[in-house]
């Protein structure tokens, strides 16, 4: 996607010096800090948090 400032238009991977292209834990081409909520709890659920090393939002390990 050449319209994405984080994306190398040839490889569609993060540009040099950038961490990520997109994802719930990616903002302005960088990973969000560990502990940033990426999915708010619903009902009996628990919040999910960014790890600081990935653009993905991992499932809370304490969920049933």
UniProtKB/Swiss-Prot annotation:
Main location: secreted
Domain Disintegrin residues, every copy: 1-64
Any one annotated GO CC term: extracellular region
PROSITE patterns in alphabetical order: DISINTEGRIN_1, DISINTEGRIN_2
Any one GO MF annotation of this record: toxin activity
Cystine bridges: 6-29, 20-26, 25-50, 38-57
Gene3D superfamilies per record: Disintegrin domain (4.10.70.10)
Extent of motif Cell attachment site: 42-44
Tissue specificity annotation: Expressed by the venom gland.
Cellular compartments annotated: Secreted
Lipoprotein listed as a keyword: no
SMART domains cross-referenced by the UniProt entry: DISIN (SM00050)
Keyword terms of this UniProt record: Cell adhesion impairing toxin, Disulfide bond, Hemostasis impairing toxin, Platelet aggregation inhibiting toxin, Secreted, Toxin
Family annotation (InterPro entries): Disintegrin_CS, Disintegrin_dom, Disintegrin_dom_sf
Protein family (similarity comment): Belongs to the disintegrin family. Dimeric disintegrin subfamily.
Complex and partners: Heterodimer with VB7B; disulfide-linked.
Role of this protein: Poor inhibitor of platelet aggregation. The disintegrin inhibits the adhesion of cells expressing the RGD-dependent integrin alpha-5/beta-1 (ITGA5/ITGB1) to immobilized fibronectin. Inhibition on alpha-2b/beta-3 (ITGA2B/ITGB3) is low.
Misc. remarks from the entry: Negative results: does not inhibit alpha-1/beta-1 (ITGA1/ITGB1), alpha-2/beta-1 (ITGA2/ITGB1) and alpha-6/beta-1 (ITGA6/ITGB1).
Record's protein name: Disintegrin VB7A
The organism of origin for this protein: Vipera berus berus
């Amino acid at each position: 996607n050449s319209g994405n400032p984080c994306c190398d238009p040839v490889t569609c991977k993060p540009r040099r010096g950038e961490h990520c292209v997109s994802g719930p834990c990616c903002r302005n081409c960088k990973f969000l800090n560990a502990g940033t909520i990426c999915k708010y709890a619903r009902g009996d659920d628990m919040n999910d948090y960014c790890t600081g090393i990935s653009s993905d939002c991992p499932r809370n390990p304490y969920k049933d």
